[in-house]
């Protein structure tokens, strides 16, 4: 007789397999005894074997018993079965002790959870994510998870990117780029280009141009030839409204107004011209998405609000708040008083100082990129050439390289083909903007010794016994600030925050409150 009995055990966990074998004459006897339990899923019974598989759970008071005459030659098998039966009994004892241990642990866990819930409800209003129960963050940078490790770009990366920007592309549809080649000496460096703003010079400089330069000014007249807009890339409808008249255009985009139901302008759409070379489309998309990322992140009263970016019919559009005036037209028509000029200059410095506090340099501060709202407040636009020169929690300043910006406004170090501080370039450009507002003209065409006016400024500045004609022509209260902002050496040039904190600017600030 072979008996496998397990009584008074709760859910025995069998970690071994037990096989009961019999000869043919014993099949009927075994079958009769196992009929009641043959339906159990953890018992596998065949013609000549009964198998209790591993990792099965046996019910309480489970008994398997069968009797039959076992031949002497089967005695070894009987001993084998009895050994397994004893093993199962030992496992049952072990399981019982583990079960009691788990039960006690479960009770302790439930009591701990109830205590935590009571404490949490009483102290923090039932918030399990309270700061009271958070662990203090580690101050060791090595404990930061790897997914939050960021590396700043190397200088070689920016150099290679700048070389790639020199690839020649056709900006106008149908390959009609002759007009741009004549107007913009920085053509084919798009989308980042050094813009030769001789059209601005033609408006501001009052003297008559003669000789070979006369034909150049005739060709660069922006009204002399209209741009052709590719109808396949034009978009007439957006979620913000329908696009209407074109109110402005540049080398790589044009501006269309969006009116409300009363036909009053509420937004403008900056529509970018895609390159005809499809291989450059990826760079085109990446460039303008980067511009949108800069603009949409900035939140300041003197910086334009960029609301959305839309990709439709292979054309990228930026939805921007509508501002009715531009600073260039405002000053050329003679509407700018001395006090208003100082106020607008303070607002310009305030907006640029905000950008610099975030480690961002504009790199293309000029009259065309400064708009005015209904109350004549300054709005800085166009962040296509913005550059991150400082990262949080770092003391180093990333240097920029390459000719970026508009020639009358750029600092002299930009033309030296050496790395330079982009924030110092913004300081220089802001000072040039003030000179244009106050004098109604540019101080020079390009900050290079080949330009007579700039060469005169450098000569007079280096001579301690001579006063600069440019500085002396400015209003008295602004001379000292502009003098330090137009320092030839960008290492000793004053910062935007320094210019903003001068006595002159603080007095102007009081008039705006």
UniProtKB/Swiss-Prot annotation:
EC annotation from Swiss-Prot or TrEMBL: 2.7.11.1
Binding positions (ATP): 247-255, 270
Keyword annotations of the record: ATP-binding, Cytoplasm, Kinase, Nucleotide-binding, Nucleus, Serine/threonine-protein kinase, Transferase
Keyword Cytoplasm applies: yes
One Gene Ontology cellular component annotation held by this UniProt entry: cytosol
Segments of this protein annotated with the region Disordered: 98-120
InterPro entries, per the entry: Kinase-like_dom_sf (IPR011009), Prot_kinase_dom (IPR000719), Protein_kinase_ATP_BS (IPR017441), Ser/Thr_kinase_AS (IPR008271)
CDD domains for the chain: STKc_HAL4_like (cd13994)
Keyword ATP-binding among record annotations: yes
Catalytic activity: L-seryl-[protein] + ATP = O-phospho-L-seryl-[protein] + ADP + H(+); L-threonyl-[protein] + ATP = O-phospho-L-threonyl-[protein] + ADP + H(+)
Active-site residues annotated for this sequence: 364
Primary location: cytoplasm
GO function term, MF aspect, one: protein serine kinase activity
Biased composition range(s): Low complexity: 98-114
SUPFAM superfamilies tied to this protein: Protein kinase-like (PK-like)
PROSITE patterns on file: PROTEIN_KINASE_ATP, PROTEIN_KINASE_DOM, PROTEIN_KINASE_ST
Class of enzymatic activity (EC top level): transferase
Protein kinase domain segment(s): 241-505
Subcellular location: Cytoplasm; Nucleus
Homology family: Belongs to the protein kinase superfamily. Ser/Thr protein kinase family.
Protein name: Serine/threonine-protein kinase ppk8
């Amino acid at each position: 007789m072979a008996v496998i009995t397990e009584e008074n055990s709760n859910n025995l966990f069998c970690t071994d397999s037990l096989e009961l074998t019999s000869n043919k004459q014993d099949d009927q006897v075994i079958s009769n005894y196992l009929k009641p339990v043959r339906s159990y899923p953890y018992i596998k019974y065949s013609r000549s074997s009964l198998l209790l598989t591993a990792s099965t759970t046996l019910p309480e008071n489970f008994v398997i018993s069968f009797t039959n005459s076992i031949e002497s030659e089967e005695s070894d098998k009987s001993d084998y079965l009895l050994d397994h039966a004893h093993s199962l009994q030992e496992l049952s004892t072990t399981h019982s002790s583990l079960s009691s241990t788990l039960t006690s642990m479960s009770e302790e866990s439930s009591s701990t959870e109830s205590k935590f819930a009571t404490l949490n409800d009483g102290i923090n209003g039932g918030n399990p994510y309270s700061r009271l129960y958070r662990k203090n963050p580690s101050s060791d940078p090595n404990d930061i998870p790897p997914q939050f490790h960021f590396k700043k770009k190397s200088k070689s990366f920016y150099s290679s990117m700048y070389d790639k920007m020199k690839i020649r592309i056709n900006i106008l549809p149908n390959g009609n780029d002759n007009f741009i080649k004549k107007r913009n000496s920085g053509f084919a460096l798009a989308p980042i280009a050094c813009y030769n703003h001789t059209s601005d010079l033609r408006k501001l400089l009052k003297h008559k141009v003669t000789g070979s330069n006369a034909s150049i000014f005739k060709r660069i007249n922006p009204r002399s030839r209209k741009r052709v807009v590719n109808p396949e890339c034009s978009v007439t409808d957006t979620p913000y409204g329908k696009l209407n008249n074109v109110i402005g255009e540049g080398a790589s985009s044009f501006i269309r107004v969006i009116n409300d139901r009363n036909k009053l302008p509420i937004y403008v759409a900056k529509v970018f011209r895609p390159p005809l070379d499809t291989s450059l489309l990826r760079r085109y998309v990446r460039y303008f998405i980067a511009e949108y990322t800069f603009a949409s992140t900035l939140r300041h009263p003197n910086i334009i609000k960029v609301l959305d970016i839309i990709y439709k019919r292979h054309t990228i559009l930026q939805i921007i708040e509508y501002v009715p005036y531009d600073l260039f037209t405002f000053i050329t028509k003679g509407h700018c008083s001395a006090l208003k000029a100082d106020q607008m200059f303070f607002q310009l410095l305030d907006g640029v100082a905000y950008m610099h506090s975030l480690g961002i340099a504009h790199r293309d501060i000029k009259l065309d990129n400064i708009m005015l709202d209904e109350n004549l407040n300054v709005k800085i636009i166009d962040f296509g050439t913005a550059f991150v020169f400082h990262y949080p929690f770092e003391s180093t300043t990333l240097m920029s390289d390459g000719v970026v910006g508009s020639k009358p406004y750029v600092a002299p170090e930009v033309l030296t083909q050496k790395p330079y501080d982009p924030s110092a370039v913004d300081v220089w450009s802001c000072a040039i903007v003030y000179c244009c507002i106050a004098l109604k003209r540019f101080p020079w065409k390009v900050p290079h010794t080949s330009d007579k006016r700039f060469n005169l400024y450098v000569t007079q500045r280096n001579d301690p016994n001579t006063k600069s004609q440019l500085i002396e022509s400015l209003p008295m209260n602004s001379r000292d600030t502009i003098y330090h902002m137009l320092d030839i050496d960008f290492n000793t040039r004053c910062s935007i925050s320094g210019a903003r904190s001068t006595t002159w600017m603080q007095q102007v600030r009081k008039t705006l409150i």
